[in-house]
Amino acid sequence: MPSSLKGLGQAWLSSSSMALSACCSVSAWQKRLPVLAWLPRYSLQWLKMDFIAGLSVGLTVIPQALAYAEVAGLPPQYGLYSAFTGCFVYVFLGTSRDVTLGPTAIMSLLVSFYTFHEPAYAVLLTFLSGCIQLAMGLLHLGFLLDFISCPVIKGFTSAAAIIIGFGQIKNLLGLHNIPRQFFLQVYHTFLSVGETRLGDAILGLVCMVLLLVLKLMRDRIPPVHPEMPLCVRLSCGLVWTTATARNALVVSFAALVAYSFEVTGYQPFILTGEIAKGLPPVRVPPFSVTMANGTVSFTRMVQDLGAGLAVVPLIGLLESIAVAKAFASQNDYHVDANQELLAIGLTNMLGSFVSSYPITGSFGRTAVNAQSGVCTPAGGLVTGALVLLSLDYLTSLFYYIPKAALAAVIIMAVVPLFDTKIFGMLWRVKRLDLLPLCATFLLCFWEVQYGILAGTLVSTLFLLHFVARPKTQVSEGPVLILQLASGLHFPAIETLRDIVLSRALEVTSPRPAVLECSHVCSIDYTVVLGLAGLLEDFRKQGVSLVFSGLQAPVLHTLLAADLKGFQNFPTLEKAEQYVRQELGMEPYNVCEDSVPEHKVTLLTA
């Protein structure tokens, strides 16, 4: 006994030391802290490119952050509070060199739905979303995102683009007292169109035209080559820089126009107004809030957030990982989806301590980052520093930014979110996928969570129907040969049973059958019971039911169940030959290039 205990202890120590060495290996540390993989190779060339990219993204995110705070129904400074935490956290934890985390149009829309325009609710939602996202990363639950199909995502983003864009019409036209619910918003906007402020409308339209022209200019800049004349390269660089920083330039132009009118004593525009100066205070997220009618407890706040605690973290993860994978594929590198969950989860958790609202990966700013030639996530340090500098020194200047200019920035940012091609593509490829797309798209105008839930439910029903009604290829002849074209799970066993019984036993002359199961990789207890029942039915009729091509795990399960009359053959030919011999028919010899002469039908039950 002592020797066995000693051996057991040595084995435990050996396995523990191996596990510890695996956890402490360089590759393990690099996986959890990706910065350790690229930092030792960092160069001056990378520093230059990262600085340019970080500056470009910073000039884009500052006006966008102010605008997205308006979409979220929060004071403008909360957009800037949300724009810098991700820059610093992602440098250490992110696996994509291109992704930039920060406020986005879609997340701002979700925040406006669930936080009642109350900053305390928004900050608490950030903290709880971060906890949920971090837990999903630690528990490797990222696969749950796979159940939200592409048509659902496209339906949601297209609806969000319309909701966000139309929601800014009131600021573009200078209208007041417009409700935030979409249908009421449409009604009251058209009802109040006669109250349009001419100054806001003209400035907003001019800003939109300028943004569009600058975007088209950037899209048409030819690739720069070293053999080009210096003046051509400089011109292309100047145009590209101007077009990339178009949001900042257009907002600055609008602010200068507004300031010029302010000096004369006449102001035709609605301005952003006072913004809290300085950096945000570092404090614990609010777990209760004092309202006009009393103090709201943490439990009550969680109840008020409701479905937002599921929708916001899931959509945040989905958007960020989709952006990361898209640019990783485009630029030929790999991202770790689970590590991305950890990065965005920790970003939101830490961001809640500086009054951030929930953030995610931004497609538009990530595109700017990639096109600027960023080499590592270190470009985010420059972006974050620029946002902090603007908070510390520029907030007094933000007073003069017209709301119409910010509305123009938002509208031009969300236009690409509406995917007009997806409807035609699905019509050509698989029309059934239009159902979850349209369900999501239409119901999102009522409530966002209903749209996402309906689309996901429809997609899941399609998936469950496919599992419960597997495609089955049946070969008719003296021997019924049934080939499962997909897996076999417990919802499908009754369908399989009905097909086999109706084709083999419920006929004038019962015949034997062969189940070809090479595509079945796993079964459960319900399937075992169903197959046992089939074997019993065949035995009562005096004919055989045999199996072929069972994979090792499935064969092991069926052998462990000790089914009476169970027989398995390695190939379909051998199984069919055995049954034919049992019937007293001539032996069936199959050469390599011969095919059994059966009438084949495809059943899609």
Curated annotation (Swiss-Prot):
Disulfide bonds: none
Main localisation: membrane
Residue spans crossing the bilayer: 51-71, 73-93, 99-119, 123-143, 147-167, 197-217, 250-270, 304-324, 341-361, 374-394, 398-418, 448-468
UniProt-listed InterPro entries: S04_transporter_CS (IPR018045), SLC26A/SulP_dom (IPR011547), SLC26A/SulP_fam (IPR001902), STAS_dom (IPR002645), STAS_dom_sf (IPR036513)
Extracellular side: 1-50, 94-98, 144-146, 218-249, 325-340, 395-397, 469-605
Keyword terms, alphabetized: Anion exchange, Cell membrane, Ion transport, Lysosome, Membrane, Transmembrane, Transmembrane helix, Transport
One of the GO BP terms on file: oxalate transport
Domain STAS: 479-582
Catalytic reactions on record: hydrogencarbonate(in) + chloride(out) = hydrogencarbonate(out) + chloride(in); sulfate(in) + H(+)(in) = sulfate(out) + H(+)(out); oxalate(in) + chloride(out) = oxalate(out) + chloride(in)
Domain of life: Eukaryota
Record topology, Cytoplasmic segments: 72, 120-122, 168-196, 271-303, 362-373, 419-447
Transmembrane helix is among the record's keywords: yes
Compartments, as annotated in UniProt: Cell membrane; Lysosome membrane; Apical cell membrane; Basolateral cell membrane
Record's bilayer topology term: Multi-pass membrane protein
GO cellular component: apical plasma membrane; basolateral plasma membrane; endoplasmic reticulum; Golgi apparatus; lysosomal membrane; nucleoplasm; plasma membrane
PROSITE patterns membership: PROKAR_LIPOPROTEIN, SLC26A, STAS
GO MF annotations, alphabetized: chloride channel activity; chloride:bicarbonate antiporter activity; secondary active sulfate transmembrane transporter activity
Family to which this protein belongs: Belongs to the SLC26A/SulP transporter (TC 2.A.53) family.
Described function: Sodium-independent anion exchanger mediating bicarbonate, chloride, sulfate and oxalate transport. Exhibits sodium-independent sulfate anion transporter activity that may cooperate with SLC26A2 to mediate DIDS-sensitive sulfate uptake into high endothelial venules endothelial cells (HEVEC). In the kidney, mediates chloride-bicarbonate exchange, facilitating V-ATPase-mediated acid secretion. May function as a chloride channel, playing an important role in moderating chloride homeostasis and neuronal activity in the cerebellum.
Name the record gives this protein: Sodium-independent sulfate anion transporter
Lineage start: Eukaryota, Metazoa, Chordata, Craniata, Vertebrata
